[in-house]
Amino acid sequence: MPDPRDDDEAATAMPERAFFGRRKGHKLRSHQADLIAELLPRLSFDLGAPAPARLETLFASGIAEVRLEIGFGGGEHLIAEALAHPTTGFIGCEPYVNGMAKILAQIEARELGNIRLFAGDAAELLAWAPPASLARVDLIHPDPWPKRRHWKRRFVQDTSVAAMARVLHEDGEFRFVSDIDDYCAWTLAHLLRSKEFCWTAERACDWQLPFAGYTMTRYGRKAEREGRRAAYLHFRRAAAAPNDRAKAGEL
């Protein structure tokens, strides 16, 4: 089965990284190229420097918590969340140039000050972030890597689940959306075998219906038109055992 994402959503990749393949995208327009050259560096941060004790300090004052969206595509969901939650800081991770250019245009037009961007490997970002520093991680319609020999490239792996558990604070959230049944089953299996996460669904509608206030992405609308139904999986970070909290420096 081919990768179902649109070619223009799976656009030109930034330098090499662990969980993303290279794809050639459309040539950037002049203003988009200017945004990549001028605005992106102002919104990015250097993983070569030590992480701040609190990620809220990456933003202007007034930020109460920080969320991460991994692979934001065209940025529809991330922009809507940033507009709806002005006191929340959002870190958007996206390796493809065209997706980055799209969200930069929206940030500029809407004068949003609560979004920071990272064009590198999400695994490196998770390793850099301090423990218990994120309120939520969103993974919306990720690349399913459908061929068996490519499953190791899927973002959801035991290692990434452990990395998210480390950076999410107690009762923090992980939200996963996909219309690819195999990847949904894969994700559910990985999260259910982790002691650090609890699946919140109590009835079928809890995973069959979008989250409250959820903004559908362009790819999500396309999938619906073509008759593919997405699953909306919601997990919470379980309370850490006392010895785990001690290792994290909380005791």
Curated annotation (Swiss-Prot):
Record keywords, A-Z: Methyltransferase, S-adenosyl-L-methionine, Transferase, tRNA processing
The protein's enzyme class: transferase
GO cellular component terms attached to this protein's record: tRNA methyltransferase complex
Keyword Iron-sulfur listed: no
GO molecular function: tRNA (guanine(46)-N7)-methyltransferase activity
Keyword Hydrolase part of the UniProt annotation: no
Biological role: Catalyzes the formation of N(7)-methylguanine at position 46 (m7G46) in tRNA.
PANTHER family per UniProt: 3-DEOXY-D-MANNO-OCTULOSONIC-ACID TRANSFERASE/TRNA GUANINE-N 7 - -METHYLTRANSFERASE, PENTACOTRIPEPTIDE-REPEAT REGION OF PRORP DOMAIN-CONTAINING PROTEIN
Protein family per UniProt: Belongs to the class I-like SAM-binding methyltransferase superfamily. TrmB family.
Protein name: tRNA (guanine-N(7)-)-methyltransferase
Protein's organism: Rhodopseudomonas palustris (strain BisB18)
